[in-house]
UniProtKB/Swiss-Prot annotation:
Its cofactor is Mg(2+). Keywords: Aminoacyl-tRNA synthetase, ATP-binding, Cytoplasm, Ligase, Magnesium, Metal-binding, Nucleotide-binding, Protein biosynthesis. The keyword Protease does not apply. CDD domains: PheRS_alpha_core. GO terms for cellular component: cytoplasm. Pfam families: Phe_tRNA-synt_N (PF02912), tRNA-synt_2d (PF01409). GO terms for biological process: phenylalanyl-tRNA aminoacylation. InterPro entries: aa-tRNA-synth_II (IPR006195), aa-tRNA-synth_II/BPL/LPL (IPR045864), Phe-tRNA-synth_IIc_asu (IPR004529), Phe-tRNA_ligase_II_N (IPR004188), Phe_tRNA_ligase_alpha1_bac (IPR022911), Phenylalanyl-tRNA_Synthase (IPR002319), tRNA-bd_arm (IPR010978). This is Phenylalanine--tRNA ligase alpha subunit. The gene is pheS. Tetramer of two alpha and two beta subunits. Binds 2 magnesium ions per tetramer. It catalyses: tRNA(Phe) + L-phenylalanine + ATP = L-phenylalanyl-tRNA(Phe) + AMP + diphosphate + H(+). Its EC number is 6.1.1.20.
């Protein structure tokens, strides 16, 4: 058998073996059999030493052509095997596009966030500026700048989280008011609300939390009167609780305001007739307020004979509890999805 016949037979056998290889492993074995260092094609190259010199170039060219042919067939077969494997995998993992998709849970705004944003939008519409402040505050701005010197007995009204002797977690957002007035350097007007978290050493129960949200408001200008405060609070009550709400002012005491009042709104559930929400009084307490104490104005650099003002503070937690019928303030902070899911329907309806 001549060398040409041997190469032709080898080529035919290689093509048969390649076509019979059904996976990558079998194809690799065929490649080693023919093109490996000890393979059939490599053996042909070794025979070249026995040929006359004038025949070696032509023989070497034919062997290389055979190698290229086998390699080309191997590449094509490998490509085909990959395609068959992919098609089989796709067939096994067929997705029925007619089936309904998996339900994806969509969140909604927290009831406290909704309430705070509603209050902020209300006061923005009245021309107020929203001002943020520090939650870790100096004792001076938390107490002394608000007419509460170190010896003042009213400090006992608020148990505080002290970090050092002069640094504490703020017990109200009033320090933001003091700092804002100080920055204005005695020049009015000042018209701000201060939303934020506050901290007090209360034992957590259905109506108390060591951390809660507060929004305080401050207006300072010339000729600000108690009637301005009352008119503002009436508008706020009607916007938050309904147009038919009424308010009443009860005398109270706050060191930073004089006079000071507690503000009640007529019960929106019983219309003032008496029920469990208002404890059968017909009224619900919603905030504290008063005219800014002259000492507070003076300490902030305002002339109390020229300027006057009013301040108020409300708890969005309590307002949200009243609006949504929530009986335990702790529900706001436990992140219970079952509780929060109830407010999706409210948001979908676009209700406040």
């Amino acid at each position: 058998m001549t060398q040409n016949d041997l190469m032709s037979e080898l080529k035919q056998q290689a093509l048969v073996d390649i076509n019979e290889a059904n996976d990558a492993q079998a194809l690799q074995e065929v490649k080693v059999k023919y093109l490996g260092k000890k393979g059939s094609v490599s053996a042909l190259m070794k025979n070249m030493k026995d040929l006359p010199n004038e025949e070696k170039p032509a023989y070497g060219q034919k062997v290389n052509e055979l190698r290229q042919t086998i390699q080309s067939e191997l590449d094509e077969r490998q490509k085909l095997i990959k395609e068959e494997k992919l098609n089989q995998q796709l067939s096994e993992e067929t997705i029925d596009v007619t089936l309904p998709s998996r339900h994806i849970e969509i969140g909604s705004k927290h009831p406290l966030t909704r309430t705070v944003e509603e209050i902020e939008d209300l006061f923005l519409g009245l021309g107020y500026e929203i001002v943020d402040g520090y939650e870790v505050e100096q004792d001076y701005y938390n107490f002394e700048a608000l007419n509460l010197p170190k010896s003042h007995p009213a400090r006992d009204m608020q148990d505080s989280f002290y970090i050092t002797e002069e640094i504490l977690m703020r017990t109200h957002t009033s320090p933001v008011q003091a700092r804002t007035m100080e920055k204005r350097k005695g020049q009015g007007p000042v018209k701000i609300i201060c939303p934020g978290k506050v901290y007090r050493r209360d034992s957590d129960d259905a109506t108390h939390s060591h951390q809660f949200t507060q929004i305080e408001g401050l207006v300072v200008d010339k000729n600000i009167k108690m009637s301005d405060l009352k008119g503002t609070l009436e508008l706020v009550a009607k916007k938050l609780f309904g147009a038919d709400r009424e308010i009443r002012l009860r005398p109270s005491y706050f060191p930073f305001t004089e006079p000071s009042v507690e503000v009640d709104v007529s019960c929106f559930k019983c219309k003032g007739q008496g029920c469990n929400v208002c404890k059968h009084t017909g009224w619900i307490e919603i905030l504290g307020a008063g005219m800014v104490h002259p000492n507070v104005l003076e300490m902030a650099g305002f002339d109390s004979k020229e300027y006057s003002g009013f301040a108020f503070g409300m708890g969005p937690d309590r307002i949200a509890m009243l609006k949504y019928g929530i009986e335990d303030i702790r529900h706001f902070y436990t992140n219970d999805v079952r509780f929060l899911d109830q407010f999706k329907a409210v948001e979908d309806r676009g209700e406040q």
